[in-house]
Amino acid sequence: PMTISVIIYEKQFGSRNETPQHLKYEVSDFENLEQTPAYFKSNHDQLLAGYVYTNPEVVHPNGVIIVAHGLGAGHNTYLPEIYYMTQNGYTVFAYDGTGNDESEGKSIVGLPQAVIDLDYAINYVKDDEQFDGLPIMLYGHSMGGYAVIAVLNHHLDITAVVERSGFY
């Protein structure tokens, strides 16, 4: 039984994940959506591709929402949700986790890595002065849903969480 578990785990998490083209969106698909690159490092010094999304018409955002993507897709799959958030007055910080799309890493490693990457993303947002004074919220889907719940043990100051189809 253990051998079967290892085989399944390696098949799921043992390689890089590139989002299929039919699941990707582009910023140009949305009006009033601006994207600014914001790269940061995670636990093994791997560079993660992060992006700040804003609506240029919003002068004083309600807060910053950090988006943690699910298994099988990078952050750009969530651009419709990100667009909705920005059009309702929020700044969004989204990123590709280790081994996903534009981020470094030979594989996505596993569920614990999703939590680790989110922890580093939260710390990046907390340390970046453009987010000073803004409440921090989390939005996670699937594997990202797992991460947004699990990371709360380390960040008691998170204002709100949306966990969509997560598993724990």
Please tell me what each predicted stretch does.
Residues 1-41, 51:
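An N-terminal hydrophobic leader/cap segment in hydrolases
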Residues 71-84:
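The serine-hydrolase catalytic nucleophile loop
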Residues 124-128, 134-168:
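Primarily recognizes the serine-hydrolase "nucleophile elbow" in alpha/beta-hydrolase
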Residues 68, 95-97, 164:
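Alpha/beta-hydrolase
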Residues 50-60:
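Short beta-strand-to-loop junctions in surface cap/lid or active-site-entrance loops
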Residues 82-104:
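Conserved alpha/beta-hydrolase
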Residues 108-129:
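Alpha/beta-hydrolase active-site loop
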